[in-house]
């Protein structure tokens, strides 16, 4: 016998976390939402509605797919005796067209997530284990690019080599005023399954940013993820070099472990190091957390982080959050 939830899914064609295809159309809707309760060191408790994100997929032709992600960021902040939406911003995260030539060759044009490492490509709150994000996954480079990309899987290379090659000449589609976007950029990311449980990747990017024109930066990164039986270990390391010299260079990395505790409860631990340009020494961040993953679409996270040599005001303290994938 079907449960009420299963029956509803059968009636509407919708299942939580899988998106909803509009009947009699080629349009699919999805998205996610995330909210957090934070107690950052030295500040009062804060309740934030962090993200309300809408995904739209449209496939008018067999080979052509259009995709957009629009996100309402920080739509509501509640503190002691104060409620505000002053920080609300409607961001265009992604807007692109994909043309599928074959498994080995596809083309993308528009605004997309910069293919550096793994975290940036799967950063949606319901898909990651922690509320906070490692600094190396967003500080050294713009997380979005507007331009063109060729990507695919080369099945002739061992178990299959995934690749992305991209370029940007700036002119960001709806640039986020909080970010220093690309002026010019090109780069690549390669990912390879060494075995069934281990994926490794390398990244390279050469770029110039809008607010720092004339300064060329080279970013080199490696990433790896091992997962088996509910356990997971992941890491990313990155080095950014600058034409302005060592004082403008950045480097860092993290290693994160996840272990099942029984049922739907998981323990999470992470160590990260990050040295921002001009900052000496780098910051060391330790994190411990507990997650309750109800299913693939709904997760409750709790974590506490502590920093050493925190001269860049990296966030540390307690965070509790809930995230749902539609």
Where are the regions a protein language model picked out?
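Cleavable N-terminal export/targeting peptides
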Residues: 1-13
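Outer-membrane beta-barrel "beta-signal"
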Residues: 150, 292, 314-326
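Outer membrane beta-barrel
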Residues: 16-29, 35-170, 191-196, 261, ...
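Membrane-embedded beta-strands of outer-membrane beta-barrel proteins
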Residues: 52-54, 95-97, 148-150, 188, ...
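Detector for outer-membrane/organellar transmembrane beta-barrel domains
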Residues: 16-18, 22, 64, 181, ...
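Outer-membrane beta-barrel domain signature
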Residues: 40-44, 81-85, 135-141, 173-179, ...
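Residues that define the transmembrane beta-barrel architecture of outer-membrane proteins
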Residues: 45-50, 88-93, 142-146, 182-186, ...
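C-terminal hydrophobic structural anchor segments
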Residues: 258-301, 308
């Amino acid at each position: 016998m079907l449960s009420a939830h299963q029956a509803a899914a059968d009636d509407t064609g919708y299942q939580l976390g899988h998106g909803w295809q509009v009947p009699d159309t080629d349009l699919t809707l999805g998205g996610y939402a995330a909210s957090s309760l934070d107690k950052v060191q030295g500040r009062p408790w804060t309740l934030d509605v962090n993200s309300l994100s809408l995904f739209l997929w449209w496939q008018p032709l067999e080979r052509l797919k259009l995709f957009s992600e629009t996100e309402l960021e920080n739509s509501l902040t509640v503190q002691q005796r104060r409620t505000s939406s002053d920080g609300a911003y409607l961001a265009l995260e992604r807007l692109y067209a994909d043309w599928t030539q074959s498994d080995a060759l596809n083309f993308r044009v528009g605004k997309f997530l910069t293919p550096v490492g793994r975290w940036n490509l799967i950063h949606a709150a319901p898909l990651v284990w922690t509320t906070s994000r490692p600094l190396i996954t967003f500080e050294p480079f713009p997380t979005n690019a507007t331009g063109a990309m060729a990507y695919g899987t080369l099945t002739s290379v061992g178990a299959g080599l995934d690749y992305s090659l991209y370029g940007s000449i700036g002119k960001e589609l709806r640039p986020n005023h909080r970010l220093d976007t690309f002026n010019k950029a090109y780069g690549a990311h390669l990912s390879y399954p060494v075995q069934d449980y281990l994926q490794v990747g390398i990244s390279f990017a050469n770029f110039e940013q809008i607010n720092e024109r004339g300064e060329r930066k080279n970013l080199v990164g490696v990433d790896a993820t091992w997962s088996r039986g509910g356990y997971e270990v992941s890491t990313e390391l990155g080095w950014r070099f600058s034409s302005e010299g060592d004082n403008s260079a950045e480097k860092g990395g993290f290693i994160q472990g996840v272990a099942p505790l029984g049922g739907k409860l998981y323990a999470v631990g992470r160590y990260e190091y990050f040295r921002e340009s001009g900052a000496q020494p780098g910051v060391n961040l330790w994190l411990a957390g507990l997650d309750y993953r109800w299913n693939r679409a709904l997760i409750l996270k709790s974590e506490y982080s502590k920093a050493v040599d925190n001269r860049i005001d990296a966030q540390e303290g307690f965070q509790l959050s809930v995230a749902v994938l539609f």
